[in-house]
Amino acid sequence: MVKVEVLGMILAGGQGSRLYPLTAKRAKPAVPFGAKYRIIDFVLNNFVNSGIYAIYVLTQYKAQSLTEHIQRYWRFGAFLEDHFILLVPAQMYRYEELGPVWYRGTADAIYQNLHLVHNHAPKAVAVFGGDHIFKMNIRHMVEYHYDTRADITIAAYPVPVAEATRFGVLQVDEEWRITEFQEKPEEPKPIPGRPDTALASMGNYIFRTEALFELLEADARDETSAHDFGKDVIPRALREGYRVYAYDFHRNPIPGQEGPNLYWRDVGTLDAYYEASMDLVKVVPEFDLFNPEWPLRTANLFSPPAKFVHETGERVGRALNSLLAGGVIVSGGTVRESVLFRRVRVNSYSLVERSVLFDDVEVGRYCRIRNAIIDKNVKIPPHTEIGYDLELDRARGFTVTPEGVVVVPKGYRF
């Protein structure tokens, strides 16, 4: 195989149980987001926009829709050997050594595919999660990794100390070399000189290739290990004196974007997913989908334009402060602060507010929907209300989140 300088390895096998029912039939990275994308698209765009084109995507849980999406729409062609995005399903590649086991953790997923790393002989390996919403110039992080002569560089997100108990926290010295790793500590340690701020690990890593091999081979031999980067591999690296540095995500430069890079969301719960979706419909969104210098590629399905029809009395087709994909028809209804995916239809006299409607949802006449996430292929009968009577919504079998968001599963029939 052809040699590359930086090899990308994306961990996309997550079950995403806290996103159920959106993950009932798909992996977490395959969950739709932002009217036309899937969650995996954002990290893939980060690699491609950073000029890193040799990428493996490691899959495991309910990967069919994710596989189809990447195989169909993320293709470089056949003429550049160092330009590829290839799927790597869990396949018991080390069966003779480990026995009949699938990926046992994030570190084990990479360990079981070290032969791919060896084949490309990269200078550095970028191990990133496939389930976050963010923009990142990964090349800038790689250069920082080289400049510090690090064995491992961890992307870090500064957070208020009071919020840091939810994350793995990195303790650094004056040069941002990591001295300690705390997994969801009760009393997080702040950044030197910034007593109100702690460094949260984003779970994205750059490894010197030799260090990656050494650490993963040692971890595989450890029968007490959970084979997880955050819980096992990084603490081992610190104990054994490896040079481990933190990279300040806020200082990551994005072409066409002014100021610090502030937006990173782990959409690992239904409420977090909903909140991130609502971020997109603000007049000045925290996460900008419209930056031409940082294009966000995804499936090009050649949908027709969105369409708004009828303007008679109360029968007015309109959408306000919303994101609408191609093929949407708002036929005499009103859409406010919502995200509508492809081929959604909102019929006359209906109101959709602060909701996310996936592909091929149809809202009948005189419906009222608010604070809802409705998965694909749901036909809502006329005069239906969703999000107004939560006990009724629960009785229908819908999921109601702690924040009161109603989630209608894929293909639900009324």
UniProtKB/Swiss-Prot annotation:
Instruction: Give the reactions, separated by semicolons, that this protein catalyses.
Output: alpha-D-glucose 1-phosphate + ATP + H(+) = ADP-alpha-D-glucose + diphosphate
What GO biological process terms are annotated to this protein in UniProt?
glycogen biosynthetic process
Pathway annotation: Glycan biosynthesis; glycogen biosynthesis
Please name the GO terms that the record assigns under molecular function: ATP binding; glucose-1-phosphate adenylyltransferase activity
For whether the record's keyword set contains Aminoacyl-tRNA synthetase, the answer is: no
User: What EC number is given for this enzyme?
Assistant: 2.7.7.27
* Domain of life, per lineage: Bacteria
Q: So where does alpha-D-glucose 1-phosphate get bound?
A: 103, 168, 183-184, 201
Ribonucleoprotein among keywords: no
Class in the EC hierarchy, top level: transferase
Q: Which UniProt keywords apply?
A: ATP-binding, Carbohydrate metabolism, Glycogen biosynthesis, Glycogen metabolism, Nucleotide-binding, Nucleotidyltransferase, Transferase
Matching Gene3D superfamilies, A to Z? Answer: Hexapeptide repeat proteins, Spore Coat Polysaccharide Biosynthesis Protein SpsA, Chain A
One Pfam family of this chain: NTP_transferase
Function, as annotated: Involved in the biosynthesis of ADP-glucose, a building block required for the elongation reactions to produce glycogen. Catalyzes the reaction between ATP and alpha-D-glucose 1-phosphate (G1P) to produce pyrophosphate and ADP-Glc.
Q: Which family does it belong to?
A: Belongs to the bacterial/plant glucose-1-phosphate adenylyltransferase family.
- NCBIfam families noted in UniProt: glgC, PRK00725.1, PRK00844.1
State the oligomer form and interacting partners.
Homotetramer.
Protein name per UniProt: Glucose-1-phosphate adenylyltransferase
